[in-house]
């Protein structure tokens, strides 16, 4: 073990030599290798390799964008962008674009302001114009109806009188002459209708001898009533109430003719006294209507005559 081979001794010697050589070369201050010397790169600022390989300078260059943001707030680039980011400048600045673009919000009130004035005029004028006419029309129509109702109270068939004349209230108003004339015209229309109906019965055939006689007499009587009513309307419609003598004479004639028409209606029905068939009921239905209207018309004529006589 204490004995080494020559080969081992040789290897050990070489190793020791190499170690010594390496140690001496690293500790030598006179080494001229510029690439391994740390002092020249840091001390020489003008050397290109240290500047390009220096790790400290690249970071400031790459981080330089972070430093500019603080200074720019006072610079113009941020002041030009401040309107879009900062809401206070647009509101404070009257010449800024946003307020002028929002200014249309004020025109709507201006455009709506004209719409508020129109409502007051229409509401006031239509109501003021319609209220007098509607109230006047309602009052006038009610007055006319009251006049007809009061006038019909003197008739024998009050309901028939009012129902037949009330549709003509606006024409009659409070005029007793028009009231009498319209009453006569309604009576004449009913008499013509009854005369036509009775004539159709006589032409129908199938009647008994008594029915034929009664129908023929009735046709004649109603015909006379129609004539009397027509004469009465003609005279009453053109009467001059200012001439009292003429007025009294005409009114006397009218009263006589209308009374005769009423008598004719009664005579018509008297002819069916011996008839017990349905024909009598049919004729009676029409003739009775004429007789009642004639009776009412005669009462209104008498009222008109007495009113004018008292006035004279």
From Swiss-Prot:
GO terms for cellular component: apoplast. Keywords: Apoplast, Disulfide bond, Glycoprotein, Secreted, Signal. It holds the Pfam family PMEI. Residues 24-36, 44-55, 76-85, 93-104, 125-137 have a biased composition (Low complexity). GO terms for molecular function: pectinesterase inhibitor activity. Induction: Induced in leaves during infection by Botrytis cinerea. GO terms for biological process: plant-type cell wall organization or biogenesis. It is found in: Secreted, Extracellular space, Apoplast. Residues 56-75, 105-124 have a biased composition (Pro residues). Residues 1-25 form the signal peptide. NCBIfam families: PME_inhib. Pectin methylesterase (PME) inhibitor involved in the maintenance of cell wall integrity in response to necrotrophic pathogens. Modulates PME activity and pectin methylesterification during infection by Botrytis cinerea and contributes to resistance against the pathogen. Belongs to the PMEI family. This is Pectinesterase inhibitor 10. It comes from Arabidopsis thaliana (Mouse-ear cress).
């Amino acid at each position: 073990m204490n004995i080494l081979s020559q080969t081992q001794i040789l290897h050990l010697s070489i190793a020791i030599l190499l170690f010594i050589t390496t140690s001496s070369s690293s500790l030598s201050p006179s080494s001229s290798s510029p690439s391994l010397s740390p002092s020249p790169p840091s001390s020489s600022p003008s050397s290109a390799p240290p500047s390009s390989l220096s790790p400290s300078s690249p970071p400031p260059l790459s981080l330089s964008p972070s430093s500019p943001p603080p200074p720019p707030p006072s610079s113009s680039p941020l002041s030009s962008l401040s309107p879009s980011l900062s809401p206070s400048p647009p509101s404070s600045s009257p010449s800024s674009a946003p307020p002028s673009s929002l200014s249309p919000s004020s025109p709507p009130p201006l455009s709506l302001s004209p719409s508020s004035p129109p409502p007051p005029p229409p509401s006031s004028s239509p109501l003021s114009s319609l209220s007098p006419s509607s109230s006047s029309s309602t009052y006038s129509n009610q007055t006319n109806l009251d006049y007809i109702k009061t006038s019909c109270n003197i008739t024998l068939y009050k309901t028939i009188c009012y129902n037949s004349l009330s549709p003509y209230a606006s024409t009659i108003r409070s005029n007793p002459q028009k009231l009498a004339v319209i009453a006569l015209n309604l009576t004449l229309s009913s008499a013509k209708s009854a005369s036509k109906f009775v004539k159709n019965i006589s032409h129908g055939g199938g009647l008994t001898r008594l029915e034929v006689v009664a129908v023929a007499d009735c046709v004649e009587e109603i015909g006379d009533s129609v004539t009397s009513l027509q004469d009465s309307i003609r005279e009453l419609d053109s009467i001059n109430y200012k001439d009292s003598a003429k007025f009294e004479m005409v009114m006397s004639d009218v009263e006589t003719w209308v009374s005769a028409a009423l008598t004719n209606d009664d005579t018509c029905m008297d002819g069916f006294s011996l008839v017990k068939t349905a024909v009598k009921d049919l004729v009676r239905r029409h003739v009775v209507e004429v007789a009642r209207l004639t009776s009412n018309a005669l009462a209104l004529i008498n009222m008109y005559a007495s009113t004018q006589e008292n006035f004279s």
